[in-house]
Amino acid sequence: MERKQGRRASYDRILIVSEGSKTEPNYFREIRATYRLHTANVEVRPSELGSAPIQVVQYAQALFEDGDRHKNIQRRAFEKVYAVFDRDDHDSYHDALALAASLDGKLKNDAKQPIRFQAIASVPSFELWLLLHYEDIQAPLHRNEVMRLKLHIPGYDKGAGNAFAITGEHLAAATQRAEALAKRFSAHTEPEPFTAIVDLV
């Protein structure tokens, strides 16, 4: 969600749709507030179709294409759309990745420009991104192991609205570790552990 320079005076309009209804939306809203990004430029919404990866991608597509007048979201009013979800044990994980890839550059916004449509997946879960702020993780993790995050953040609670404030001082380390994981596992069809959250922060 970093500021773009040169191409235009304002930010790209970004839509982020997440699997979770608290943890991920709160994290991205906290970043938006920290960097004083206007809500008109960065819209963060949980999926209303369900939490399966394919449902998250489908909801992101529908919200982009149709908008939502009840939420004051205009049709096709974004340059970038991100669908954020976990691998977990979801059967639709690979279908969601494929659908997002098929939409990238194919949908056009209200300025008739092709948009970026990207799946932001984490294996096993979003908490891996937070854990990377404190640990250099190379081996696969069980979902429950990710909760050792509480060793670094006593009292950590999923959905709390202060995760970015707590972990922010270690952002550079997390970014470096996440990018290293992506390179290490780029040849694998099923990378683990992995998180693309770094692409948004």
Where are these predicted regions, by residue range?
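Phosphate/oxyanion-binding active-site loops and adjacent basic polyanion-contact surfaces
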Residues: 20, 24, 49-61, 192-196
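C-terminal accessory helical subdomains adjacent to catalytic cores in phosphodiester-
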Residues: 1-15, 25-47, 66-201
